[in-house]
Amino acid sequence: MKTYTVAVLGATGAVGQEMIKVLQERNFPVGKLVPLASARSAGKTVKFRGEDVTIQEAADTAFKGVDIVLGAAENDIAKKFAPAIVASGAVFVDNSSAFRLNPEVPLIVPEVNPEDVKNHKGIISNPNCSTIITVTAVNALNTIAPIRTMTASTYQAVSGAGAGGPIELMNEVEALREGKTYEPKVFSHQIAFNLIPQIGGEQFEGYTSEEMKMQNEGRKIMHRPELKVSCTCVRVPVVRSHSISVSCHFDVPVTVEQAREVIAKAPGCKLVDDLKNKQYPMPLDTSDQDIVFVGRIRPDLTDDNGLCLWCCGDQVRKGAATNAIQIAELLVKE
């Protein structure tokens, strides 16, 4: 079997570490792993298939001989190294938002638009975590009738803000338990026992950057430039896995039974929808999973042609690392 040299750019971060873990779990044909990070991490090691692999400093010369680069770094790092990656002949599967809306760069969720992988010119973008979870959950509904408009509210775990998010949540809980104060460093407000209805800065007409990512990326992935989307993104005191409440509106009636049938068969989805027996998606159940749980499917009482649903997914795995490795799997099948 052919093997590939795979680099992980940002190998010491939460998503980079998860990428290395998922490469092993999915038995991706890695002949050589090249973990890349900043100078301060160079010389340290990561475990891969039971071996210690030395981390190298990210530099333009580090991509020579690499077939696939999995990007788990911030926008500025992705933009800095993208030219060298493409020039080296590698394919850059980038988890940052740097290239997502570039018309020359495919934006891929393998369960939704795998065919777009063939259009790459050296860079493929991994969508925003909440976007991935949402479009995976709702895309099958388009086989019944095209979604005309969509309204979503996200409930995003603190680990979505990086490794410091869960630490801050736990520190605040402990401080409050002891009657002490704790000055937030990661979040703009106390997150323990609280909700923060802002993720990202203000970008357009009162919408945040995170909310605009959801709206713009969903259109591109589903090839629906005319789709109207409105979104509210909220940070919640949950450690891992994002949850999304979605209302979809169509030009014709779509029944709950129809929706359940197509979602139950949809790739990457698990139908968990039994309200009488208290069975529905919850972040605790989806953590460390690679599929999106979908439930609470019901009519939208404000629109005869509308449906509401609730979905949960692990934002570190399906929302980032696993989706990137699935894209790499599409590449090696070409």
Please give the residue ranges for each predicted region.
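Charged docking surfaces used in two-component/phosphorelay signaling
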Residues: 69, 158-334
